[in-house]
Amino acid sequence: MDLIFTSVLIGIGLAMDCLAVSFAVGAHQKTSRIRAAFILALFFGGFQGGMTLLGWLLGSGFADAIAAYDHWVAAGLLFIIGGKMVLDGIKDGHEEEAPDVFNFVAVFILAVATSIDALAVGLSFSLLHIVPLIPALIIGLISAIFSVGGVYSGGKIGHILGKRVDILGGVILTLIGIRILLEHLVWNGAGA
């Protein structure tokens, strides 16, 4: 199969987490959607492409070391952020200004959590002796595009649902974390 076509398919698969997280953030963010879309596209696209290259550079020796706990880290980060969003959504009281989800730490955590699979893809490129520069660029670009789409579609839904969208966003992030754990612990037959 052609490397570019395969890279597009891999990019779409990896971008689904970026899309879901961007949707949740877009729905939660009340203002500055252009800024939100730009920041998430930059971070998510950059991290997806960068982690693909990093995985390739580190090679197969590192895969065994990180495989034992990568899913716990990614899921834990998503559970923390998702749980905070759910709690914010169920708090009684008047509508508060949305928290600044675009501080560096929050965006960094989300970017790392959504790009750990890209690290594994890069490791597989290393094992297959594929130089991943073009695939990493394609993966990063697709993730950036999906991130922009997620912010804008989440923003449209956010206006309809109001404060309940915090709960929806938190549930989405938590479900992504659960999916990551199920993939590694159940569906792949891996142990804890």
UniProtKB/Swiss-Prot annotation:
It is found in: Cell membrane. One of its GO terms (cellular component) is plasma membrane. Keywords: Cell membrane, Ion transport, Manganese, Membrane, Transmembrane, Transmembrane helix, Transport. The keyword Cell division does not apply. It is a multi-pass membrane protein. The keyword Ion transport applies. One of its GO terms (molecular function) is manganese ion transmembrane transporter activity. Pfam families: Mntp. It comes from the Archaea. The chain crosses the membrane at residues 3-23, 38-58, 61-81, 101-121, 130-150, 167-187. Probably functions as a manganese efflux pump. Belongs to the MntP (TC 9.B.29) family. This is Putative manganese efflux pump MntP. The gene is mntP.
